[in-house]
Amino acid sequence: MDNHPKILACASIGGHWIQLQRIANALKDDYEISFVSSNEKCRSSVEGHRFYHIKDFTRKNPWWIIPNFFKCLYIIIKEKPKAVITTGSAPCLLCILAARLMFKKAIWIDSIANVERLSTSGKIASKIASRMYTQWPDLAVGKIKYAGNILG
């Protein structure tokens, strides 16, 4: 796999992680994929791949934003991915931001759970990401594209 381009895939646990795993499975033959998650339990589902853990945070508990940002920056410098791809949530915004600061492609795919509007993180990501996708056609406006859904 040494000659395959690298991708850094980031998601929190639950639906975000399941959707990211489906994307990674579709890309595994063409890319070397490393993973980042805010939940250490995700490590066991990606054995054989490099895995990095970042701390979870929310708007109500923002204490890990700065340390996580520097860890994301470190991961991107170390891994040298061609692109960062994420299905969210908030901690993964930092990977997208770090990727853009390092002149890497950053792809945000908003969760399929967001039927009526983009997630709060998705709204922020739409201003940072080089590519932004929704899984609902009605939410595709401007820079935000619809290309189908991951679970369908």
Which sequence ranges carry the predicted segments?
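Extreme N-terminal starter segment of soluble prokaryotic enzymes
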Residues: 2-8
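Structural motif
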Residues: 6, 82-83
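Residues at the starts of beta-strands that form the adenosine-phosphate
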Residues: 6, 31-35, 50, 104-105, ...
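Short amphipathic alpha-helix
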Residues: 9, 16-27, 40
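Conserved nucleotide-sugar phosphate-binding/catalytic loop shared by glycosyltransferases and other
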Residues: 11-13, 31-68, 138, 147-151
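An amphipathic, basic-hydrophobic alpha-helix
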Residues: 60-82, 101
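Active-site-proximal region of nucleotide-activated glycan assembly enzymes
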Residues: 104-152
